[in-house]
Amino acid sequence: MEMEKEFEQIDKAGNWAAIYQDIRHEASDFPCRIAKLPKNKNRNRYRDVSPFDHSRIKLHQEDNDYINASLIKMEEAQRSYILTQGPLPNTCGHFWEMVWEQKSRGVVMLNRIMEKGSLKCAQYWPQKEEKEMVFDDTNLKLTLISEDVKSYYTVRQLELENLATQEAREILHFHYTTWPDFGVPESPASFLNFLFKVRESGSLSPEHGPIVVHCSAGIGRSGTFCLADTCLLLMDKRKDPSSVDIKKVLLEMRRFRMGLIQTADQLRFSYLAVIEGAKFIMGDSSVQDQWKELSHEDLEPPPEHVPPPPRPPKRTLEPHNGKCKELFSNHQWVSEESCEDEDILAREESRAPSIAVHSMSSMSQDTEVRKRMVGGGLQSAQASVPTEEELSPTEEEQKAHRPVHWKPFLVNVCMATALATGAYLCYRVCFH
C-alpha cells in the first residue's frame, strides 16, 4: 500500500518533524474576531486557540452566542464533527446547550480531568455519588443512567433533559482515560478498538447531529481522532483506497479549526492508526478481535488520579510596569494560559524513538523563539524563580564573596598613623 511505503520512508529518514512543519506552514489562517472580543475572553481556555469566525458553532442565546467550538464538515467523507475545548467551570452549561441544539448523540472525551497536576477540564457530567447535575444558566438537567468502566476507556449513558420543554434525550459519553499526558498511545490497537466502539454505537451516523469531540484545547488529540476516522471512511468510499493522502485530509480539516494535530508524534500515530485500520477496510474482519485482545480492555482500570501535593504559598515578583506577577497561582482556568506550553512540553517529552536527532534541528530555532514568547503559563513563572543551585553557592564562593568587616578599620588606622608620623617629623625639622 502506498501509505505504508510512505510511512516507512519517512520513518527511515527520520523526517516526521520536517513534514509536520510543512503542514503547519501550509495550514489555512482565517479571522477569529468573535473569539477575541473582551466579553468572550473568559470563555476561552487558551488564549491562542480560537475558533475561526466562518466555522464556529453559534449558541441560540440572545445575549451571547459564543462558545469555543468549531464545525468540521468533511464533504467527501460525509462526516461532520464538532471539535471543542474541555469545558471551563463557567461554560459547562454552554457545552450541554450546544449538544442539545446541534442534536448530537455522542460526546468523545480524550483527556482526563487532571493531568500532570494541572486541571485540563471541568467536571461537566455527574459522578456516581451525585447522579445528576442541573445547569441553571441554560435550563438543562443531566442524569447519569449507567457507566461501563473498561481498562482504558469508560462509556457512560446520560440523559439530557430540557427543563423548559420536559423533553429528554439519551447521550453517550465515550471517555478515553489512558491517553498519555504528553504524546500518543503505545500502539494503534487500543485506539482503533475505541474508535470502532464509537462507530458501532451509531453516534457518528448522519441521522444524528455531529459528534462532539474534545480534549483540553480541542486540537491535538481531538484532531488525531477525527483525522484517523475520516481517512478510514474515505478509504472505504473510494475505489482506490491508496489514493487517500493523510496530509491533504489534515490540511482540509485545518480550514475549519486551527492547529489540528499538535505534534510530529501525533501525525506519525495517525499514519499508524490508518494503516492498521485499513486492514479492516480491506476485508480482514479478524483484526477487530485482535485489537480488542491487544487492548486488554477487560483488565482492571488504573487507580483514580492521586491529587498532587499542595503547591508552595503564593509569592510575588517585584512590580513591573505597575503590575505584579503571581507565582504558583492555582486557578481552575486561566484565559491567559497558552496552549503553546503544552506543545513545547510535548515536543520535548514525547518524541518517538524513530525520529532521528538531526531531523529535529529544523524545529529547534522555532521552539526556542516560542519558548521566549510564551509568557503566561506556570512554566515561564517557574523559570523566573532561582533554582536551588543558584540559591546555594559553594563554600569557596561564599568565602570569596563574604564581606570582610575589619578591612576599613585597618585602612583608617594606617592612614592615621602615617599622618601622625609625618606631623611629628615636620615638627622636629622646623623647631629643632
Swiss-Prot record:
Tissue distribution of the protein: Found in several tissues including central nervous system, liver and kidney. A high level of expression was found in the hippocampus.
GO biological process, one term: negative regulation of PERK-mediated unfolded protein response
Sites of Cysteine persulfide modification: C215
Residues covered by region (Disordered): 297-322, 350-402
Nuclease recorded as keyword: no
Modification type Phosphotyrosine: residues: Y20, Y66
E.C. no: 3.1.3.48
The entry's keywords: Acetylation, Endoplasmic reticulum, Hydrolase, Membrane, Phosphoprotein, Protein phosphatase, S-nitrosylation
UniProt catalytic activity: O-phospho-L-tyrosyl-[protein] + H2O = L-tyrosyl-[protein] + phosphate
Annotated positions binding substrate: D181, C215, S216, A217, G218, I219, G220, R221, Q262
Residues annotated with Phosphoserine modification: S50, S242, S243, S335, S362, S364
Mod. after translation: Ser-50 is the major site of phosphorylation as compared to Ser-242 and Ser-243. Activated by phosphorylation at Ser-50.
InterPro entries assigned to the protein according to its UniProt record, in alphabetical order: NR_tyrosine_phosphatase, Prot-tyrosine_phosphatase-like, PTP_cat, Ptpn1/Ptpn2, Tyr_Pase_AS, Tyr_Pase_cat, Tyr_Pase_dom
Keyword Phosphoprotein (UniProt): yes
GO molecular function ontology, one term from the record: protein tyrosine phosphatase activity
Membrane topology: Peripheral membrane protein
Modified-residue entries (S-nitrosocysteine), positions: C215
Active site: C215 (phosphocysteine intermediate)
Domain Tyrosine-protein phosphatase: from-to ranges: 3-277
Cross-referenced PANTHER family: TYROSINE-PROTEIN PHOSPHATASE NON-RECEPTOR TYPE 1, TYROSINE-PROTEIN PHOSPHATASE NON-RECEPTOR TYPE 61F
Record function comment: Tyrosine-protein phosphatase which acts as a regulator of endoplasmic reticulum unfolded protein response. Mediates dephosphorylation of EIF2AK3/PERK; inactivating the protein kinase activity of EIF2AK3/PERK. May play an important role in CKII- and p60c-src-induced signal transduction cascades. May regulate the EFNA5-EPHA3 signaling pathway which modulates cell reorganization and cell-cell repulsion. May also regulate the hepatocyte growth factor receptor signaling pathway through dephosphorylation of MET.
Assembly notes: Interacts with EPHA3 (phosphorylated); dephosphorylates EPHA3 and may regulate its trafficking and function. Interacts with MET. Interacts with NCK1.
Protein name: Tyrosine-protein phosphatase non-receptor type 1
Organism: Rattus norvegicus (Rat)
